[in-house]
Design a protein with these regions (language model features):
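Carbohydrate-associated surface elements
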Residues: 174, 195
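A conserved mid-protein helix/loop that constitutes part of the nucleotide-sugar donor-binding site
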Residues: 21, 123, 217-236, 259-262, ...
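Aromatic "clamp/platform" in nucleotide-sugar-dependent glycosyltransferases that forms part
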Residues: 303
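Short hydrophobic beta-strand element within catalytic cores of glycosyltransferases
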Residues: 320-323
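Short alpha-helical donor nucleotide-sugar binding micro-motif in glycosyltransferases
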Residues: 282, 290-295
């Protein structure tokens, strides 16, 4: 069976179990057609550094087995705090990644490298692929613009690496458009959306309770995710829906994310909805799925979203989605599955929530589940991955 080296900083581990679940699901989907070894770098934390984040990074094991017994290796890499030296990430991390990858390749030759994100993973993967003479593909989970316009040093590395990448895969058309804006119309790109595990995210069973006064937000509380916009929308709905509340499921991994979360909590007090926004913190996929089935709607209020895996998970759970037109959700959301509204507009978001909650003809949970599984289930994703790997290994897709 094809041996694939998966390179991704974002991958679940025993300390951060919800980190990069979308990468893990693609590995699960690939399991019937490929043997994957995952290299998931972790920031090196000096022994005397007592920050909570440093202690957690140190607790990540050097190697472990992921879902399905997939070997996951965690080399320690140099990672400076903040983004000031972002352009040096690939250079600083490559020695540690190369050492581990070379050992994997010696023990069993790698046939293909699949990196998640073009930088730094894709840039490092391109160097390994050139060294081993094996093809490289990258999955792109972020919009390249305005990011690469803001980081010219990173942009140069991406453009230089691109000729050594057989296929640059986007999770949505919005991401694909930004890739072509950087690499040109001739770039070999493709679409490989995120997958949903329909065994976890199932439609509600007959008689399963749904709380019509609960709407759900799932994800890290980062400014770009727009929870502040949802809080203002909730305040706008307060007089007509005094019982409506928001359940927030998600963990702030990093310092800036925690500061963003604190800012949202202050906003909740300022606009008078602190008692109706419940921050539950980290949640397992099973807890998220249960909350989706029991909520009236999932709200995705993002300023920018490359895909929105949680929206697909909600549909698979039989729950409609209110989302902003922020990039990825436009590929699969419509009036059949919920509604789309402009970003950064609390009044429009409130109107969208109102329209979904007040819909005359209720959404059919079984129909929403079918839509999600048909387009993004594990079975269809396995077929996509198999076709992709077969084509790449046959020599297709070179720029």
């Amino acid at each position: 069976m094809t041996h694939v080296l998966v390179l991704s900083r974002n991958y679940p581990n025993s300390v951060f179990p919800s980190l990069g679940l979308w990468a893990e699901r693609l590995v699960q989907a690939a399991a019937p057609v490929a043997d994957c070894t995952v290299v998931a770098p972790v920031p090196w934390a000096p022994p005397l550094l007592r920050l909570r984040s440093a202690q957690r990074f140190r607790a990540v094991p050097a190697a472990e087995r992921g879902v399905g017994g997939v070997p996951v290796i965690h080399p320690r890499v140099m990672a400076l705090p903040g983004t000031r030296l972002h352009g040096l990430d690939a250079r600083m991390q490559f020695p540690s990644v190369r050492a581990v990858a070379e050992q994997v390749h010696r023990e069993r030759p790698v046939d293909l490298i699949h990196a998640h994100f073009i930088y730094p993973e894709g840039v490092m993967a391109a160097r390994l692929g050139r060294r081993w003479q094996v093809p490289v593909v990258t999955s792109e989970h972020a919009l390249w613009l305005p990011w690469l316009d803001q980081w010219p040093a990173v942009r140069r590395q991406v453009v230089l690496a691109a000729p050594n990448i057989a296929r640059v895969l986007a999770v949505s058309r919005a991401v694909q458009d930004t890739i072509h804006a950087i690499l040109g119309p001739e770039a070999h790109t493709g679409l490989l959306p995120n997958a949903v595990d329909e065994q976890v995210f199932r439609a509600p069973a007959p008689g399963e309770h749904r709380d019509t006064n609960q709407i759900l937000f799932v994800g890290a509380v980062r400014h770009v995710k727009g929870l502040d916009v949802l809080v203002r929308a909730l305040a706008a709905l307060a007089h007509e829906r005094p019982a409506l509340r928001v359940l927030v499921l998600g963990e702030a991994f990093y310092g800036q994310w925690r500061r963003d979360e604190d800012a949202v909590k202050r906003l909740c007090h300022e606009v008078g909805v602190a008692d109706r926004v419940i921050f539950e913190g980290r949640a397992t996929p099973e807890r998220v799925a249960a909350a989706m089935r029991s909520s009236a709607a999932l709200v995705v209020p993002g300023r920018r979203e490359s895909f929105s895996a949680v929206a697909i998970e909600a549909l698979a759970s039989g729950t409609p989605v209110v989302a902003t037109r922020c990039g990825g959700p436009e590929d699969f959301l419509s009036e059949v599955t919920g509604t789309l509204v402009p970003p950064e507009d609390p009044a429009a978001l409130a109107a969208g929530i109102r329209s979904v909650l007040d819909r005359g003809e209720p959404f059919d949970p079984a129909a929403l589940h079918r839509i999600a599984v048909t387009g993004f289930g594990m079975g269809v994703t396995t077929s996509r991955v198999e076709m992709l790997y077969r084509e790449i290994l046959a020599g297709g897709g070179r720029r």
